[in-house]
Each structure stands twice: as C-alpha cells, then as structure tokens.
C-alpha cells in the first residue's frame, strides 16, 4: 500500500522557519498536525470514533501536544464545548457521538480542531450534512472564531452562499487547478473566468422564482488523462484552437484579482 503522504510537485512552506511540509519527516508532521494545522471534515458522524466519548477525543489532541494532566485536559474540553455553543458541556463531554445530533457533532469537531489554538483551520465542506438552520449557526461560529482568535480558515466548498458569508479571498478551482483568484467582493461583482461566470449564473435567484436553473454543459475531465490545453476548454462557450493547445498563464485584472484564461488575456490586451 502507498504511504499516507504522496507529493507530486510543489512546496508547502511554513513561514517562521521555511520548513517544507511536503518533505517533512513523520515526526515533524505529528507535531504540526492538530497543533498548528487542524481540520474539520465533511461528515462529522463518520469522523468521530463511535466508541470513545467526545470528551476523550478532544482530550487526546490536547494531551498529545501539551504537557497537562488529564484533569486539566478534561476541563479544557468542557470549556471548548461551551465556546462552540453546546449547552450543558459538562454533561456532553461524557457523551458518545451517537447520542448527539449532526449539528452538535460538527460543533464537537470544531472544538477538537481548535483545542490547541491552530494557526490554520482547514474546513472541508463543514456544513454539507447539516440543515440550513444548523448551517447558519456553524458559519456564524466560524466567523466568530476567525475574528476572535485570529485563526486563518481554509474553507473548501461548492456552496457559493457559504463562500459569500465566510470568505475574505477566494480561489476558484477547476480539475485541481486554480483558474481565478480574487477578494470575495471583487469575485462576486466582477467574475472573469468562464467557469466562474458559469457558477455564478447557476445560482438560484429569489427574484426569478420558477426560472429554470442554468447549468454548465459537459463534465469534468478524467484527472488521469487531463488535456494538454485548458482543462475547461471542452465545456467553454468561448473555446478556440489556442485553448486546446496550451495552458493559459496568469492574467492580472487588479492587484489581487488574477485569471488564467486566454479569452480574458486577449480582452485585457485590447483594453490596455
């Protein structure tokens, strides 16, 4: 079986000492994982161990990275559950995941991820399995934690509504490649890449009730057999021969707005 870490290309460097996480040893990664970098997974019910109490699962991360007693770690677990909005945390800390709702399990995952005050929190579709009411509460909680603790959040989502509510800066990816990056307000008001425009046009609108939703024709290319040209070419309404022959390069729209698209590149040349 392959190892748990496979790096195909590129570096992931830590600012303070330049440590490349892509080539770091297992011991170095163990110190960073759950401590400096934490993650909230998409399915809380399947990410938590069903035969271990939620308190013990939070305590495990604290005891791994900090020199504290079990009593201190349990008190921290209770405090963390309270911080993420769980009522009666002193009782819930001894509950098993199956005794909690999906929303409460997601809050437990957030408490666990924040237990060692990480610098970076990776949230992979953190609200997908939740109803809209709980989703709004979780997003509000993430915004609160971001503002109060200074933790950076890398949010992975397909929901543009979630992006608008939480993100400061957005990278739009297609077939594993960034095609547009911009501050969130700029991206929503001035999308440039045809894929980004297609995503925006596919959003349902309350002002146009009953209107059929727009879709992007075609399907994502097989990641094992990616085309040599633009990955979006086969689905793009503006495709040209050039798009199928090579990869587009970075086109600067504004200081923090960049697009990888031949069409946009030509438009900027004409304007400029």
Predicted regions and their residues:
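A short, proline-enriched helix->beta-strand linker immediately N-terminal to the Walker B motif
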Residues: 115-119
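Conserved ABC ATPase signature
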Residues: 95-100, 104
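Short catalytic/signature loops enriched in Gly
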Residues: 18, 87-90, 181-272
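ABC ATPase NBD coupling module
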Residues: 7, 14-38, 64, 186-191, ...
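ABC-type ATPase nucleotide-binding domains, specifically the catalytic core motifs of the NBD
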Residues: 17-19, 23-29, 56-72, 82-87, ...
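P-loop NTP-binding/switch modules centered on Walker-like glycine-rich loops
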Residues: 122-126, 130-211
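Conserved ABC ATPase "signature" region
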Residues: 11, 16, 72-91, 200
């Amino acid at each position: 079986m392959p190892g748990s870490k496979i790096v195909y290309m590129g570096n992931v460097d830590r600012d303070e000492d330049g440590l490349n996480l892509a080539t770091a040893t297992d011991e170095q990664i163990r110190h960073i994982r759950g401590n400096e970098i934490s993650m909230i997974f998409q399915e809380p019910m399947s990410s938590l161990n069903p035969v271990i109490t939620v308190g013990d699962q939070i305590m495990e991360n604290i005891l791994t990275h900090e020199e504290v007693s079990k009593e201190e770690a349990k008190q921290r677990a209770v405090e963390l559950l309270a911080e993420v909005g769980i009522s009666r945390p002193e009782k819930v800390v001894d509950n098993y995941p199956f005794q909690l709702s999906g929303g409460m399990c997601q809050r437990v995952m957030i408490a666990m991820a924040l237990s060692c005050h990480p610098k970076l929190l990776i949230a992979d579709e953190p609200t997908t399995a939740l109803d809209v009411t709980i989703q709004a509460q979780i997003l509000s909680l993430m915004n609160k934690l971001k503002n109060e603790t200074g933790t950076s959040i890398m949010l992975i989502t397909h929901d543009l509504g979630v992006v608008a509510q939480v993100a400061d800066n957005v990278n739009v990816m297609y077939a594993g490649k960034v095609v547009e990056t911009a501050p969130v307000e700029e991206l929503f008001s001035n999308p440039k890449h045809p894929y980004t425009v297609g995503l925006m046009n596919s959003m349902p609108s309350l002002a146009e009730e009953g209107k059929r939703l727009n879709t992007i024709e075609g399907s994502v290319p097989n990641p094992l057999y990616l085309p040599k040209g633009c990955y979006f070419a086969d689905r793009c309404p503006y495709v040209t021969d050039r798009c199928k022959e090579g990869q587009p390069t970075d086109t600067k729209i504004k200081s923090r707005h960049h697009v990888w698209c031949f069409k946009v590149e030509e438009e900027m040349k004409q304007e400029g």
